[in-house]
Amino acid sequence: MGYKISIDAMGGDHGLNTTIPAALEAVKKDSNLQIVLVGDHHKIKRALDRYSKVKKIKLPVLQRIAIHHASETVGMDESPSIAVRKKKDSSMRVAINLVKDRTVDACVSAGNTGALMATSKFVLKTINGVDRPAIVYALPAFNRETKQLSKTYMLDLGANVVCTSEQLFQFAIMGSILAASSKGIAEPRVSLLNIGEEEMKGLDNIKNAAKLLQGCDFINYNGYIEGKYIFDDTTDVIVCDGFVGNVSLKTMEGSLRLIESLIKKTIQESSLLMKIPIVMALPIFKKMKKGMNLDSFNGASLLGLTGIVVKSHGGASANAFETAIYEAIKEIKYNIPKTIQESLEKVL
């Protein structure tokens, strides 16, 4: 089955220097993939020619990449309302329009998160039964019994700072559907992020959401989960409001940088004698770093829309942006918006 994805080629901190090499690698590895690069035609063509020569991309592969001109770009610090009202020919807006027109199956952007969410909601609209879309991200999770690395989906990560219990309930349904499709499990475990595991703890909206989940046969509700267990693979879906989710995600990113800095500092300050066993352990450190590498988990989905939109980290590398493209492909294959719609019709 073939699939086509539009890419906001100008979006993100690094723009074409990230999106073009990522697109080339993705189409080279997946013969079923076609990509439409949206943005300044001249700049994209020039970058495409340069990177295709560096990567030695053959003509049959290049023929699966098209360029769609857009005259404007959305800045990383631009107001979402301005992006929606005034930037109607931005690379972001045009890339999303292609999803609406069914010219492509999904859109991937590393652009301004607020603008992407506002534009996506304005153009694509939400699925019936969904009040607001949510940003969901796959986090690394380690199973202490099997010693295997897995994924836990967490939402919302910043789209909705304040949420009602009904909205948290909707997020749980959407996250459960994504986890079931992505992880290939029939009944994903769903948990609410809270300050404790006891039933009486937490804000009223969280406690009321718990009651809704307990009464829903569709959801395999796993109770509350504390922040210290996020990486323990004790659940498949973690639900929270966008404020808590965004703070949690950025705290995780900062923690990983701290660990990496401490390891480097320890190595640099070690004596020559101590560096010998450290050098011998380098393969272990490299393997550990690979497991902690957030590039392999890049690609946050905007769940609850009638079309597929995947948000890459703004400062993502080419490898990380490529991962976001594969996340979009996965959602295309499982037709996530349609599955969410059908499930909500049964539950609500």
UniProtKB/Swiss-Prot annotation:
Subcellular location: Cytoplasm
Reactions listed under catalytic activity: a fatty acyl-[ACP] + phosphate = an acyl phosphate + holo-[ACP]
Superkingdom of this protein's organism: Bacteria
GO biological process, one term: phospholipid biosynthetic process
Species annotation: Francisella tularensis subsp. holarctica (strain LVS)
InterPro entries in the record: FA_synthesis, Phospholipid_synth_PlsX-like
EC number: 2.3.1.274
Keywords: Cytoplasm, Lipid biosynthesis, Lipid metabolism, Phospholipid biosynthesis, Phospholipid metabolism, Transferase
Leader sequence segment: none
Protein's UniProt name: Phosphate acyltransferase
GO terms assigned for molecular function: phosphate:acyl-[acyl carrier protein] acyltransferase activity
Gene Ontology cellular-component terms listed: cytoplasm
Keyword Lipid metabolism in record: yes
Lineage: Bacteria, Pseudomonadati, Pseudomonadota, Gammaproteobacteria, Thiotrichales
Pathway recorded for this protein: Lipid metabolism; phospholipid metabolism
SUPFAM superfamilies: Isocitrate/Isopropylmalate dehydrogenase-like (SSF53659)
